[in-house]
């Protein structure tokens, strides 16, 4: 098997990743200009990215009586001041605006008898959001002069003299290679999951907090192209309902459930209430023999029972099914909780591309928004949209400049360079596709498991209670480099397996050159 031909396309704007930030950026660009857009999406924009399964709340919203600066202070405190305040403020100022726009597109936001949004805490409002990604995708698909290419896996930027010219990839279904040239490129590929050994084994290994298909492609491409990155040591570990990995905030904020240990003691105040402190407290209680730990739901009302079961249907139906299968409502049994494996995700930590307030990266013409952009934690859905909008507005502004095509090199030189890189990548794709089983030592899946085992053992995974030291990190780096060398001899029986090869390579790149 080999790559099935080459498509060369040209556009004003290339958006890599058709998730929350990417789709919203496309809407903004077309609203404010006539620029042509290509969206390259590895899956299908109808159900891709973090919104694929829906959400039951907007977790970043400036509720009545609050102001954007309050949200900045919340995010700073939660991240122990490891933030860029300028990025947080520019995001926070747009949260309500993008929410209103989503409501106009058809998102159902719950309201009280006075017509006000129903708040859930100081920064959240309740929604019926199972179809939120469908709403966003339908809006994008209705735009003129926007081409959405689903099932297109982008593997490399085309960068010359620190200026981006486009990107290269292949179609997972047809096997066609793509060289897409663009004046401006927005990276919106999300964060990275699958770096560490997950909570659940075997068939259920992808039952995780973050989309398992977000493997950090944007991080890896940026690192390989020389873009400045930031704060990859800042990992996100989610506190979730055990086994289902369903969100705990729905219970904690929805019915005011406290974190308790096996003795029935409320332990959350002992350690603190920030995101990291809630996870830390749960880990310490288990280490010290007072586990398992729970969210205390026993004794809530029957109305609250029904409210919780309905809420989880909007984003994590497995939790509702677990209650039904057990024959017990939340009011009859506490909900056991645990920490997930660590993730690299700029929507909850400060890890990702180093960007300015317009979301420009350090590579000319390349922007980053959403979970791939660093410095600005606690984005959630609306924060990703806000960053997509910020980047889009600056892209439009830059496209309108008369000197946009003036570079330090000629167009002929740029074309020659792009074509050469594309040819090299196609050759690389074909090497993986043509290599037979007898010529490779380990399968991609075996190498992935080895990578996750190394990270779990030496780089602070679940198995080591998230703890590590300098010696362990050095060992992790050595072993990851060995696995990276072995990955060069991987093979792929088809184009889908070729995608798996590159997903492995992406994670090894961000671990070996940025994380450990």
PLM region spans:
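Glycine-rich FAD pyrophosphate-binding loop
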Residues: 31-53
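Mobile, glycine/GP-rich and aromatic-enriched active-site lid/loop segments adjacent to catalytic centers
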Residues: 96, 103-155, 231-380, 385, ...
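Core beta-strand elements of the Rossmann-like FAD/NAD(P) dinucleotide-binding domain
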Residues: 8-11, 174-184, 362
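Glycine-rich active-site loop/strand segments that organize a redox cofactor
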Residues: 59-91
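Glycine-rich loop(s) and the adjacent beta-strand/alpha-helix scaffold that form part
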Residues: 187-246, 382-386, 390-394
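Active-site-proximal substrate-binding core of FAD-dependent oxidoreductases
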Residues: 229, 233-241, 372-379, 393-452, ...
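Helical element adjacent to the flavin cofactor pocket in flavoenzyme catalytic cores
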Residues: 129-156, 160-163, 168-179, 219, ...
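N-terminal Rossmann-like FAD-binding beta1-loop-alpha1 element of flavoenzymes
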Residues: 13-39
């Amino acid at each position: 098997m080999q790559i099935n031909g080459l498509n060369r396309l040209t556009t004003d704007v290339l958006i890599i990743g058709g998730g929350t930030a990417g789709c919203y950026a496309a809407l903004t660009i077309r609203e404010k200009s006539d620029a042509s857009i290509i969206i390259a999406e590895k899956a299908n924009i109808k159900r891709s990215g973090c919104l694929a399964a829906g959400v039951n709340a907007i977790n970043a919203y400036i509720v009545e009586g609050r102001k954007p600066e309050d949200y900045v202070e919340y995010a700073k405190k939660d991240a122990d001041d490891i933030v860029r305040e300028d990025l947080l403020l520019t995001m926070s100022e747009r949260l309500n605006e993008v929410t209103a726009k989503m409501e106009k597109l058809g998102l159902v936001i719950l309201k009280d008898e006075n017509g006000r949004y129903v708040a859930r805490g100081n920064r959240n409002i309740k929604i019926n959001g199972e179809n939120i990604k469908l709403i966003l995708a339908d809006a994008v698909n209705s735009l003129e002069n926007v081409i959405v290419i689903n099932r297109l896996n982008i593997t490399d930027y085309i960068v010359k003299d620190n200026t981006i010219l486009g990107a290269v990839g292949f179609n997972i279904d047809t096997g066609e290679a793509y060289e897409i040239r663009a004046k401006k490129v927005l990276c919106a590929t999300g964060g990275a999951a699958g770096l560490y050994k997950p909570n659940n084994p075997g068939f259920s290994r992808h039952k995780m907090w973050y989309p398992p298909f977000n493997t950090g492609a944007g991080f890896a491409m940026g690192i390989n192209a020389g873009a400045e990155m930031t704060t990859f040591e800042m990992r996100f570990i989610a506190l979730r309902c055990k086994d289902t990995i369903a969100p705990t905030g729905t219970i904690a904020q929805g019915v005011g459930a406290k974190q308790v240990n096996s003795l029935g003691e409320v332990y959350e105040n002992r350690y603190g209430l920030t995101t990291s402190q809630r996870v830390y407290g749960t880990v310490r209680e288990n280490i010290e023999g007072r586990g398992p730990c729970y969210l205390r739901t026993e004794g809530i009302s029957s109305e609250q029972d029904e409210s919780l079961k309905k809420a989880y249907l909007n984003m994590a139906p497995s939790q509702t099914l677990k209650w039904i299968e057990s024959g017990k409502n939340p009011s009859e049994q506490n909900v056991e909780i645990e920490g997930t494996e660590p993730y690299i995700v700029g929507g909850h930590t400060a890890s990702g591309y180093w960007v300015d307030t317009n979301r420009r990266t350090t590579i000319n013409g390349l922007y980053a928004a959403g979970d791939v952009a660093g410095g600005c934690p606690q984005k959630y859905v609306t924060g990703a949209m806000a960053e997509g909008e910020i980047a889009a507005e600056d892209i439009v502004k830059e496209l309108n400049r008369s000197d946009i095509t003036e570079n330090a090199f000629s167009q002929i030189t740029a074309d020659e360079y792009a074509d050469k890189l594309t040819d090299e990548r196609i050759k690389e794709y074909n090497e993986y596709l043509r290599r037979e089983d007898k010529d490779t030592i380990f399968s991609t899946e075996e190498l992935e498991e080895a990578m996750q085992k190394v990270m779990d053992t030496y780089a602070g995974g679940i198995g080591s209670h998230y703890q590590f030291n300098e010696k362990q990190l050095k060992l992790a780096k050595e072993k990851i480099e060995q696995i990276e060398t072995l990955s060069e001899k991987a093979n792929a029986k088809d184009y889908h397996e070729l995608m798996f090869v590159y997903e492995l390579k992406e994670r090894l790149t961000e671990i070996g050159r940025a994380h450990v």
